[in-house]
């Protein structure tokens, strides 16, 4: 008993001693966490270089764009063929995807040989062989008459400019077919299929095996955004933000990048950690100086690395008592499968004995322990290096998402990861230490990369079909120049109807005379009050206008709110509230006393019989105060002043906000003869020749016409360009059937159009995973400011997602792109329609004056015009295209329509003293 214990103790001591000797001998292969973090940092830099246009040509890690832009979302379906070429055999699969109740994938496959004479022959021979095998497969499955979509897994480095094209950069593994490097493998395969002529195939996608792995796993777990292969070779791919990929146009969304990380170190960046054994292995390989990282990591080389170590240690008398056999000296006699067998927990030592005996050495027990430890060091180094490079990818994903902690899934395939008894456990453990702020789930690819190629094809098909349906819907919003010319022509017709006495009563565009007959001439002088009412808030202003050499306008104002109960109460209550606020303002300014002239900006449709009289036609914008419609608002204001008996006012002018805007700008720029508002609502006014204004007597001079163009189309004349979404928005509005042109343009409604399109797309499964959330059902959720923010060129998709999240909409990257597209299409149409309307106005002025060319300025106000990043540019462009004989300048109204009301009042006071203009 004691003898046995002593023997065991002696053996353990011997074993420990031998392990220490080997640790010392292979010290350079044992990498500390400090070194691994340094490698992680180096690889991160290499990735950045590969993505950069400037550094990519010389980068060793090529970071190849794959043009795979989306992982499966679970709605894919169809019948597909997958080809998988990249190893000793060639696999063809038929993959059927359906999701009637539970989504499932059924697969049938056949394996075909790729003999040495074919992989080392010509490219023509190779692709003829692939086409023959595909023909045989389709014959067996009785699908030769079907033109099924084909996904092609081609596991070699390729440069792609689209998903159905792949130009081979260089052969790897044992492939050497001539005439293929630098050629598009899809064209070569199509040529071979065409040559046979007995079947047809539609090659939709070419993918690398790593991408195939990611897509296979992505079908089961939509969090999967990394693919990893650790087998004969090694590689990884991941979903990168398009804005970081210089080699591909566009910055919206994501694209899968095939890193081709096997070449990491080919530029010398890993020389400090490569050992003499790595260098010897490289010298004897088919591609010296290439794929240096892969040669330190992958299954193709691991057994050979161990063999080289055994030979050197035996030569130095540290193993096998210095015995060296011909078998031990023969390359390929010690395989990675031997490494896996030797590292097994229980039978590892026994396996070592059998394998070493096969090599002709007669190993002692200590030799077997030593060889097991050598295998452990080599395979552990591999796991550590892969953990470092994968750690760099995870850090990059985390940084891209701007999140403190990353949760993601990595799809994995490869014999080394799957078959080696300790590899995956060691690899996961190291990764957790290197990237503690990432929670990573590893998902084993059960079906190989063929299913992945089919899934890429299925996703490409789904996206193409979705794209077709989305484009079909959005096409109704895309207006051709011909359509816009027609809108311009129709508005001209409506304008003529509104101006004529006999047709005015039937006209929808009312063309209301404003009795403003002159723009400021610079002689206006004095102190004026202005009242600006057009929404839930209103302003009272004191405007001090000074003429002379230095014309100045000094303004003081105070903003007051109108409670909802007053907006929707009685007319007396509304005007009493307004007068109460004026009283407060006069006290605030210390000017209560003298009777002051007042201009009243009243932004609702009014029929005017004089400058100081405006009969309200109808309330808009949520106002419902009773006993106002059909009454003169100036009289209602005067009556309320009398009831208060505190002060007196001289109501000189009732002005629409559009007219006020024109006058404000005309004070600065005398060529300003048009006013435009594009904000919550939209409207325009312009200086019309009196001879054309049949509703007012007199033919001399001009008068500003308040078009009230928001009602354009209320008679059905725009029904052919109104979409179903416009109709829904109109139906649920407060004034159904009214202001139809406004509802296609103004900020009050654009968000609603967008929301309804998003609901439609969500129902069809294109958005938000098909889930219509409560916020999306909420009317008014998309305010103009959100549309402006979402469409801003400066905003990355992450920020767009943040805005949508703020609105309670959890979106993916693809969702954000689609939302941005919808916003863009809706706002572009609004700008174009507004431009068509403005083109009609400027052409009318030009024709009125019989000019070959008109130079005119438009005074503009409104949040949509001011804040939206593209609206003004598109509108200006449309006006230019539709009215080429007019040069139109746009001047932003800085001081709102209140200043305009004061100026109109000043002009009115000036004209009172000029009897020639009555």
UniProtKB/Swiss-Prot annotation:
Reactions catalysed according to its record: a D-hexose + ATP = a D-hexose 6-phosphate + ADP + H(+); D-fructose + ATP = D-fructose 6-phosphate + ADP + H(+); D-glucose + ATP = D-glucose 6-phosphate + ADP + H(+); D-mannose + ATP = D-mannose 6-phosphate + ADP + H(+)
Tissue distribution: Expressed in flagella of epididymal sperm.
Pfam families in alphabetical order: Hexokinase_1, Hexokinase_2
Region (Hexokinase small subdomain 2): 521-655
GO cellular component: caveola; cytosol; membrane raft; mitochondrial outer membrane; mitochondrion; protein-containing complex
Family per record: Belongs to the hexokinase family.
Alphabetized PANTHER family for the sequence: HEXOKINASE (PTHR19443), HEXOKINASE-1 (PTHR19443:SF80)
Physiological role: Catalyzes the phosphorylation of various hexoses, such as D-glucose, D-glucosamine, D-fructose, D-mannose and 2-deoxy-D-glucose, to hexose 6-phosphate (D-glucose 6-phosphate, D-glucosamine 6-phosphate, D-fructose 6-phosphate, D-mannose 6-phosphate and 2-deoxy-D-glucose 6-phosphate, respectively). Mediates the initial step of glycolysis by catalyzing phosphorylation of D-glucose to D-glucose 6-phosphate. Involved in innate immunity and inflammation by acting as a pattern recognition receptor for bacterial peptidoglycan.
Stated name of the protein: Hexokinase-1
Gene that produces this protein: Hk1
